[in-house]
């Protein structure tokens, strides 16, 4: 098993280039199932989740060439509609293949998903929507078995669901007639999926709002154009927090500041200033790091995927911070590990109270999921001594070239084998 050794209390400086968004690239790669032509996608991050999805598509018969952050996908060779457990169990985003496979072939079997261990994240909203479009759905031996010719309908999502929205948008693309989706997720990753499908010839109205109208092609495949994945706002937020927790001046390149409004607002409340250019953000050190109150919510609110990183940052604040996690249960699994480093954090249900300003000490800690693991790295950067972060395969699922990027900023971080 590999682990990271991190020497704390060093200042950071310099520039870091932000990768393409994993959570945008996943549905965009899957959307190639809807294509009649070979699809070229640029700025694809080279992370474990992407490789898992590519192996799933190859398992279904697609031809994929992935190198230098570009993916060339040909799904004309698809000859299989069963997404097997062996691959799907590694990553819950595999469920995204359900809508497009069903829409294209009229039947598919997709194993129930795995991935991060953060709460239930049920797929019932996906299944209810597909049933409303005429699908016959059964759960058999751990697989979603779906069949039927999809027809447009009006669908109201009971809760905002990002993967649910993406799945049904792709299903509606090849369905017969108009689909109206209400209470759709507005995340930038969902918006890019819609824009790419529109550029591929799909008639779609309301992009960027919570109401979409999609005029399905009745099985006719789409003609995709070459495109690039948007920058990863969560990776960007993580590096901003790294600069903040070490109270350093750093610059992020190839980033979209408009996708980070909620994160930047909280950094400003904590006393940090930022300089925003067209595709860069510079974080300036704070005279005093102030406590903050955060409540997670759907975009454009504060992202749940940045909650753990801000909890680490709040440990350096002069006072008591509150984090209210509204989206997922089990999203405080990093707390017990932060306590090992001397953190003062109290949990009451979905609310965490963080008393900042106490010295953090290096420790051996264990990553439990993707974002929690980044919080441990941030805490290690601020702790006195040398920490070891174990089970970093969680990090490799979502952060590209993590230690190289941190080393480029001056962090003392090494990947080692146990």
From Swiss-Prot:
Gene Ontology cellular-component terms listed: cytoplasm
Pathway in which this enzyme or protein is active: Cell wall biogenesis; peptidoglycan biosynthesis
Residues the entry annotates as binding phosphoenolpyruvate: 22-23
Subcellular location, principal: cytoplasm
Physiological role: Cell wall formation. Adds enolpyruvyl to UDP-N-acetylglucosamine.
GO biological process: cell division; cell wall organization; peptidoglycan biosynthetic process; regulation of cell shape; UDP-N-acetylgalactosamine biosynthetic process
Compartment list: Cytoplasm
Reactions catalysed according to its record: phosphoenolpyruvate + UDP-N-acetyl-alpha-D-glucosamine = UDP-N-acetyl-3-O-(1-carboxyvinyl)-alpha-D-glucosamine + phosphate
Pfam family, one: EPSP_synthase
Residues where 2-(S-cysteinyl)pyruvic acid O-phosphothioketal is found: 116
One MF annotation (Gene Ontology) recorded for this entry: UDP-N-acetylglucosamine 1-carboxyvinyltransferase activity
Residues the record lists as binding UDP-N-acetyl-alpha-D-glucosamine: 92, 121-125, 305, 327
Domain of life: Bacteria
Annotated keywords: Cell cycle, Cell division, Cell shape, Cell wall biogenesis/degradation, Cytoplasm, Peptidoglycan synthesis, Pyruvate, Transferase
InterPro entries: Enolpyruvate_Tfrase_dom (IPR001986), Enolpyruvate_Tfrase_sf (IPR036968), MurA_subfamily (IPR050068), RNA3'P_cycl/enolpyr_Trfase_a/b (IPR013792), UDP_GlcNAc_COvinyl_MurA (IPR005750)
The UniProt record lists the keyword Endoplasmic reticulum: no
Enzyme class: transferase
SUPFAM superfamilies for this protein: EPT/RTPC-like
Name of the protein described by the UniProt record: UDP-N-acetylglucosamine 1-carboxyvinyltransferase
Enzyme Commission no: 2.5.1.7
């Amino acid at each position: 098993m590999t682990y990271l050794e991190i020497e704390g209390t060093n200042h950071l400086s310099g520039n870091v280039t932000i990768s393409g968004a994993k959570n945008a690239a996943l549905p965009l790669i899957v959307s190639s199932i809807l294509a009649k032509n070979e699809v070229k996608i640029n700025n694809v991050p080279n992370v474990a989740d992407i490789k898992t999805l590519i192996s799933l598509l190859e398992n279904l018969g697609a031809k994929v060439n992935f190198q230098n952050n570009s993916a060339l996908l040909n799904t004309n060779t698809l000859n299989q509609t069963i997404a097997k457990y062996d691959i799907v169990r590694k990553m819950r985003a595999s469920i995204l293949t359900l809508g497009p496979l069903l829409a294209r072939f009229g039947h598919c079997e997709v194993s129930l998903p795995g991935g991060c261990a953060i709460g239930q994240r049920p797929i019932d909203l996906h299944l209810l929507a597909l049933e409303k479009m005429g699908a016959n759905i059964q759960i058999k031996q751990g697989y979603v078995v779906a069949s039927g010719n999809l027809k447009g309908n009006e669908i109201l999502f009971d809760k905002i669901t990002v993967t649910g929205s993406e799945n049904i948008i792709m299903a509606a693309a090849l369905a017969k007639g108009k689909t109206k989706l209400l209470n759709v997720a507005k995340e930038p990753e969902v918006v890019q999926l819609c824009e790419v499908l529109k550029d591929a010839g799909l008639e779609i109205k309301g992009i960027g709002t919570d109401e979409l109208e999609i005029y399905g092609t009745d099985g006719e495949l789409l003609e995709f154009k070459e495109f690039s994945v948007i920058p990863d706002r969560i990776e960007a937020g993580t590096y901003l927090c790294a600069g903040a927790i070490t109270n350093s001046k750093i610059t992020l390149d190839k980033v979209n500041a408009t996708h980070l409004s909620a994160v930047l607002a909280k950094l400003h409340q904590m006393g940090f200033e930022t300089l925003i250019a067209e595709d860069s953000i510079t974080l300036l050190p704070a005279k005093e790091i102030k406590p903050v109150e955060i409540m997670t919510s759907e975009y454009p609110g504060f992202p749940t995927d940045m909650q753990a990183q801000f909890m680490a940052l709040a440990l350096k604040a002069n006072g008591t911070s509150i984090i209210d996690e509204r989206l997922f249960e089990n999203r405080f699994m990093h707390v017990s590990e932060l306590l090992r480093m001397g953190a003062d954090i109290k949990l009451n249900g979905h609310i965490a109270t963080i008393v900042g300003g106490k010295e953090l000490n290096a420790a051996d800690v264990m990553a439990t999921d993707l974002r929690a693991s980044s919080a441990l790295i941030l805490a290690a950067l601020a702790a006195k001594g040398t920490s070891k972060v174990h089970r970093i395969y969680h990090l490799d699922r979502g952060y590209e070239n993590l230690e190289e990027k941190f080393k480029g900023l001056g962090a003392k971080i090494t990947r080692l084998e146990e």
